[in-house]
Protein backbone atom coordinates (compact mmCIF):
# COMPACT_ATOMS: atom_id res chain seq x y z
CA UNK A 1 0.00 0.00 0.00
CA UNK A 2 1.25 3.46 -0.88
CA UNK A 3 -0.55 6.77 -1.03
CA UNK A 4 0.69 10.37 -1.18
CA UNK A 5 -0.88 11.30 2.12
CA UNK A 6 0.43 12.54 5.46
CA UNK A 7 -0.18 9.40 7.51
CA UNK A 8 0.72 9.08 11.15
CA UNK A 9 1.78 5.85 12.81
CA UNK A 10 -1.70 5.56 14.30
CA UNK A 11 -3.64 6.29 11.11
CA UNK A 12 -1.47 4.04 8.93
CA UNK A 13 -1.79 1.06 11.25
CA UNK A 14 -5.53 1.68 11.61
CA UNK A 15 -5.80 1.52 7.83
CA UNK A 16 -3.89 -1.77 7.78
CA UNK A 17 -6.35 -3.09 10.38
CA UNK A 18 -9.24 -2.05 8.15
CA UNK A 19 -7.68 -3.79 5.14
CA UNK A 20 -7.32 -6.94 7.21
CA UNK A 21 -10.92 -6.70 8.39
CA UNK A 22 -12.06 -6.46 4.76
CA UNK A 23 -9.73 -9.34 3.79
CA UNK A 24 -7.69 -7.18 1.41
CA UNK A 25 -4.17 -8.66 1.32
CA UNK A 26 -1.18 -6.31 1.38
CA UNK A 27 2.40 -7.52 1.77
CA UNK A 28 4.27 -4.22 1.36
CA UNK A 29 3.85 -0.87 3.09
CA UNK A 30 5.55 2.04 1.30
CA UNK A 31 5.46 5.35 3.15
CA UNK A 32 5.49 8.41 0.91
CA UNK A 33 7.59 11.49 1.61
CA UNK A 34 5.74 12.68 4.71
CA UNK A 35 7.69 10.16 6.78
CA UNK A 36 10.44 12.80 6.90
CA UNK A 37 10.47 16.50 7.71
CA UNK A 38 8.93 18.46 4.83
CA UNK A 39 7.91 21.82 6.30
CA UNK A 40 11.44 23.17 6.58
CA UNK A 41 12.88 26.67 6.52
CA UNK A 42 13.16 27.71 2.82
CA UNK A 43 16.89 28.29 3.32
CA UNK A 44 17.19 24.50 3.55
CA UNK A 45 15.42 23.87 0.26
CA UNK A 46 12.01 22.65 -0.78
CA UNK A 47 11.56 19.91 1.81
CA UNK A 48 11.25 17.25 -0.89
CA UNK A 49 14.59 15.74 0.08
CA UNK A 50 14.76 14.42 3.62
CA UNK A 51 16.25 11.73 5.83
CA UNK A 52 15.05 12.75 9.30
CA UNK A 53 11.87 11.15 10.64
CA UNK A 54 8.95 13.45 11.36
CA UNK A 55 8.57 12.51 15.03
CA UNK A 56 5.23 14.28 15.22
CA UNK A 57 3.82 11.65 12.87
CA UNK A 58 6.11 8.73 13.73
CA UNK A 59 7.32 9.13 17.32
CA UNK A 60 8.89 5.65 17.44
CA UNK A 61 9.97 4.54 13.93
CA UNK A 62 11.36 1.10 14.95
CA UNK A 63 8.08 0.33 16.72
CA UNK A 64 6.07 1.37 13.67
CA UNK A 65 8.18 -0.67 11.25
CA UNK A 66 8.16 -3.70 13.56
CA UNK A 67 4.38 -3.51 13.70
CA UNK A 68 4.27 -3.76 9.91
CA UNK A 69 6.75 -6.64 9.94
CA UNK A 70 4.65 -8.42 12.55
CA UNK A 71 1.76 -8.23 10.07
CA UNK A 72 3.88 -10.01 7.47
CA UNK A 73 4.60 -6.83 5.50
CA UNK A 74 7.83 -5.52 4.03
CA UNK A 75 8.57 -1.82 4.41
CA UNK A 76 9.95 0.96 2.22
CA UNK A 77 10.36 4.73 2.41
CA UNK A 78 10.14 7.32 -0.36
CA UNK A 79 13.20 9.47 -1.12
CA UNK A 80 13.97 12.38 -3.47
CA UNK A 81 17.80 12.54 -3.15
CA UNK A 82 18.47 15.56 -5.39
CA UNK A 83 18.92 18.28 -2.73
CA UNK A 84 21.57 16.42 -0.76
CA UNK A 85 21.82 16.92 2.99
CA UNK A 86 21.02 20.29 4.56
CA UNK A 87 21.85 21.59 8.02
CA UNK A 88 18.44 20.76 9.54
CA UNK A 89 18.96 17.00 9.13
CA UNK A 90 19.87 15.05 12.26
CA UNK A 91 22.83 13.39 10.51
CA UNK A 92 24.05 16.60 8.87
CA UNK A 93 27.17 17.16 10.98
CA UNK A 94 28.56 13.65 10.54
CA UNK A 95 27.75 13.71 6.82
CA UNK A 96 29.37 17.13 6.40
CA UNK A 97 32.49 16.02 8.27
CA UNK A 98 32.76 12.90 6.12
CA UNK A 99 32.49 14.98 2.93
CA UNK A 100 34.79 17.79 4.07
CA UNK A 101 31.99 20.37 4.18
CA UNK A 102 32.10 23.28 6.64
CA UNK A 103 29.33 22.25 9.02
CA UNK A 104 29.90 25.24 11.32
CA UNK A 105 28.75 27.49 8.48
CA UNK A 106 25.89 25.16 7.68
CA UNK A 107 27.05 24.63 4.11
CA UNK A 108 24.96 22.02 2.30
CA UNK A 109 26.31 18.60 1.40
CA UNK A 110 25.43 18.61 -2.27
CA UNK A 111 24.17 15.49 -3.99
CA UNK A 112 26.97 14.36 -6.31
CA UNK A 113 26.15 10.94 -7.67
CA UNK A 114 29.32 10.90 -9.78
CA UNK A 115 31.49 11.07 -6.64
CA UNK A 116 32.31 7.61 -5.19
CA UNK A 117 32.88 9.18 -1.77
CA UNK A 118 29.42 10.72 -1.77
CA UNK A 119 27.87 7.41 -2.81
CA UNK A 120 29.65 5.66 0.06
CA UNK A 121 28.50 8.17 2.68
CA UNK A 122 25.02 8.40 1.12
CA UNK A 123 24.41 4.78 1.98
CA UNK A 124 26.43 4.56 5.19
CA UNK A 125 25.01 7.64 6.91
CA UNK A 126 21.61 8.22 5.30
CA UNK A 127 20.22 4.79 4.52
CA UNK A 128 21.82 2.08 6.62
CA UNK A 129 20.68 3.64 9.94
CA UNK A 130 17.09 3.62 8.67
CA UNK A 131 17.47 0.01 7.55
CA UNK A 132 18.67 -0.87 11.05
CA UNK A 133 15.36 0.58 12.29
CA UNK A 134 13.44 -1.76 10.00
CA UNK A 135 13.32 -0.32 6.46
CA UNK A 136 13.59 -3.17 3.94
CA UNK A 137 14.14 -1.20 0.73
CA UNK A 138 13.72 2.27 -0.80
CA UNK A 139 11.46 3.99 -3.29
CA UNK A 140 13.77 6.15 -5.41
CA UNK A 141 11.52 8.97 -6.60
CA UNK A 142 14.01 10.97 -8.67
CA UNK A 143 12.36 13.80 -10.65
CA UNK A 144 15.19 16.32 -10.95
CA UNK A 145 16.71 15.93 -14.40
CA UNK A 146 18.82 13.42 -16.27
CA UNK A 147 22.38 14.69 -16.04
CA UNK A 148 25.37 14.61 -13.69
CA UNK A 149 28.86 16.12 -13.94
CA UNK A 150 29.90 13.02 -15.91
CA UNK A 151 28.64 13.21 -19.48
CA UNK A 152 26.13 10.47 -20.23
CA UNK A 153 25.70 9.38 -16.61
CA UNK A 154 22.01 9.52 -15.78
CA UNK A 155 21.39 10.11 -12.05
CA UNK A 156 18.42 7.76 -11.83
CA UNK A 157 20.35 4.99 -13.59
CA UNK A 158 23.25 5.26 -11.15
CA UNK A 159 20.87 5.42 -8.17
CA UNK A 160 19.09 2.29 -9.35
CA UNK A 161 22.43 0.52 -9.87
CA UNK A 162 23.87 1.34 -6.46
CA UNK A 163 20.66 0.88 -4.50
CA UNK A 164 20.26 -2.58 -6.00
CA UNK A 165 23.82 -3.57 -5.13
CA UNK A 166 23.65 -2.06 -1.65
CA UNK A 167 20.37 -3.75 -0.82
CA UNK A 168 21.99 -7.11 -1.53
CA UNK A 169 25.12 -6.45 0.51
CA UNK A 170 24.12 -8.95 3.22
CA UNK A 171 23.56 -11.75 0.72
CA UNK A 172 19.79 -11.43 0.41
CA UNK A 173 18.06 -11.03 -2.94
CA UNK A 174 18.32 -7.30 -3.81
CA UNK A 175 15.17 -5.22 -4.02
CA UNK A 176 14.64 -1.60 -5.00
CA UNK A 177 11.66 0.38 -6.27
CA UNK A 178 12.03 3.24 -8.71
CA UNK A 179 10.75 5.44 -11.48
CA UNK A 180 11.29 4.68 -15.15
CA UNK A 181 14.83 5.65 -16.19
CA UNK A 182 14.66 4.93 -19.91
CA UNK A 183 14.93 1.80 -22.09
CA UNK A 184 16.36 -1.16 -20.22
CA UNK A 185 15.91 0.39 -16.80
CA UNK A 186 13.96 -2.66 -15.61
CA UNK A 187 17.38 -4.30 -15.11
CA UNK A 188 17.40 -3.26 -11.45
CA UNK A 189 14.17 -1.97 -9.88
CA UNK A 190 10.58 -2.95 -9.61
CA UNK A 191 8.93 -0.22 -11.67
CA UNK A 192 6.73 2.50 -10.22
CA UNK A 193 3.57 2.72 -12.34
CA UNK A 194 3.09 6.42 -11.68
CA UNK A 195 0.29 8.24 -9.88
CA UNK A 196 -2.98 6.34 -10.23
CA UNK A 197 -6.60 6.41 -9.22
CA UNK A 198 -7.69 4.23 -6.31
CA UNK A 199 -10.11 2.12 -8.33
CA UNK A 200 -10.34 -1.56 -9.20
CA UNK A 201 -10.23 -0.65 -12.90
CA UNK A 202 -6.94 1.19 -12.42
CA UNK A 203 -5.49 -1.72 -10.44
CA UNK A 204 -6.51 -4.13 -13.21
CA UNK A 205 -4.68 -2.01 -15.81
CA UNK A 206 -1.46 -1.36 -13.89
CA UNK A 207 0.29 -4.75 -14.35
CA UNK A 208 -0.12 -4.48 -18.12
CA UNK A 209 0.97 -0.84 -18.17
CA UNK A 210 4.02 -1.37 -15.96
CA UNK A 211 5.16 -4.48 -17.85
CA UNK A 212 5.05 -2.55 -21.12
CA UNK A 213 6.69 0.66 -19.90
Predicted feature residues:
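Catalytic-domain carbohydrate-binding cleft regions of carbohydrate-active enzymes
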Residues: 1-213
Amino acid sequence: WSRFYAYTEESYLALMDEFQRRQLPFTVGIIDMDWHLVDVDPKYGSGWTGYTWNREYFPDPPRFLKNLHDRGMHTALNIHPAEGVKAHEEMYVEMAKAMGVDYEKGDPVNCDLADPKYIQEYFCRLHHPREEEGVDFWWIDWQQGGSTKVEGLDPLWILNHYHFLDNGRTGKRPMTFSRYAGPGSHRYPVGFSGDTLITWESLDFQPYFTANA
